């Protein structure tokens, strides 16, 4: 598996309006998916079989009642095992240089690759619980997120049908939001 990440422009999270962050996040997600597909084509031209993994939607599994989505594989965990970062209490992957402001992508390949070392830095201070304590929905519990509670506030659909990312406090309040 090849796992990679792109940085999300951090200025977008500090805008008073949620549209800049939603826009930046959507464009970066499309860019990550596009990069994955381009890499697949390059590798296939070299005779290597590939499978692109979507960096967001569509979900492999969706529970309507719990508002719980799961992808084909956990890109956060893939990023951790690829050495791209460590998992924070906010459940996001925290990269040493870019913090949690990254979008992760991956492709599966049918060749043996050399492993990168797993990151061994501290992503969250032991006593820090800013993200957990500040979550207006109380959706975080240090190891997972209650997606239903989170989605009730974070995903907002406008009258015109646009999906806006209204809450990202767990990302922005993190002292390591922009790097360690």
Regions found by a protein language model. Name each.
Residues 1-30:
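Non-catalytic, usually N-terminal nucleic-acid engagement modules in DNA/RNA processing proteins
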């Amino acid at each position: 598996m090849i796992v990679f990440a792109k940085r999300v422009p951090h200025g977008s999270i500090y805008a008073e309006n949620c549209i800049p962050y939603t826009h930046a996040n959507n464009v970066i997600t499309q860019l990550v998916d596009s990069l994955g597909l381009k890499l697949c084509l390059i590798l296939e031209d070299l005779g290597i079989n590939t499978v692109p993994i979507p960096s967001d939607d569509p979900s492999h599994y969706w529970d309507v009642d719990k508002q719980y989505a799961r992808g084909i594989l956990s890109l956060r965990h893939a990023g951790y095992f690829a050495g791209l970062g460590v998992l924070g209490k906010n459940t996001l992957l925290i990269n040493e240089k870019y913090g949690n402001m990254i979008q992760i992508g991956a492709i599966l390949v049918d060749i043996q690759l050399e492993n990168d070392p797993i990151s061994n830095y501290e992503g969250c201070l032991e006593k820090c619980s800013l993200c957990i304590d500040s979550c207006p929905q109380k959706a975080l519990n240090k190891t997972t997120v209650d997606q239903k509670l989170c989605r009730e506030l974070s995903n907002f659909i406008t009258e015109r049908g646009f999906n806006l990312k209204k809450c990202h406090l767990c990302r922005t309040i993190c002292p390591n939001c922009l790097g360690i």
